[in-house]
Amino acid sequence: MGDFSNKRVVISGASRGIGLAIAKRLAAEGASIAILAKTAEPHPKLSGTVYTAAEEIVQAGGQALPLITDIRSDDQVQAAVAETVQAFGGIDICINNASAISLTPTAQTEMRRFDLMFGVNVRGTFMLSRECLPHLLEADNPHILNISPPLDMQQKWFAPNVAYTMSKFGMSQCVLGMAGELADKGVAVNALWPHSVIATAAISNVLAGEAALAYCRSPQIMADAAAAILAKDSREFSGNFCIDDVLLAQEGVTDFSVYRMDPEKPLWSDFFVPEDTPEIEPLLAVGNPAP
């Protein structure tokens, strides 16, 4: 799909899950990866730290720079970007993957949770993109990729968890605005979102339980889709809100069974996927058991 040798990547929140899968996918093709994440010590429910992620990236074939970073902190983000440039000599790709989630209605959303989601999802995305931008402008094929949904402004996405939806759509609004702003500068800005729920520790340990993983795809589908986007010409592919399997089908992928956690179970559709999205495989609404 692409050659990422000599590509220098900054990715937030890549100590586990989708972010780590993307980092390892790019590392397998020779990329140097700076991992910006808070987890220095193992979490009681969520496996992986910035240091274990770095080990996996090196094992995959890339270089790794683990950087303990609170994406909400101006000083820490600025320092992390500076360390990346010092270590790698520049930045070609910025991936805004870090995300905070609270699937709660208005009355049950504490303001500290609201501030966390907006601090990580919106402010963190904007700030990391902003700090990387001077270096991206010097790169040959610069990309910003946000792990955020299409801007499908439907009440059904907002009503159950207003604050979370606002924050994720805020990440997508960064794509809409920055893609337009940077179009004449050759910096691509795109979004990538999963069609089905992805099997991560957050799903099994925090949101839906271990049994839910059977209805998911593995993070590898997001990693492969991200690689496909980041291999494209930044001057020709920007401002797109991509769905993982739809994009891969356009790239010629035909066998999606390799991504299923359990081939016997149907897949759950993820939040925020527009109704008119082509179904590459049949999907059920989240939480619906197999028929």
Model region roles, listed by residue range:
Residues 7, 62-63, 90-91, 136-150, ...:
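Active-site loop of short-chain dehydrogenase/reductase
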Residues 8, 15-16:
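Conserved glycine-rich cofactor-binding loop
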Residues 191-192, 211-291:
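C-terminal helical subdomain
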Residues 129-130, 176:
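A short, exposed helix-loop element centered on a Lys and neighboring polar residues
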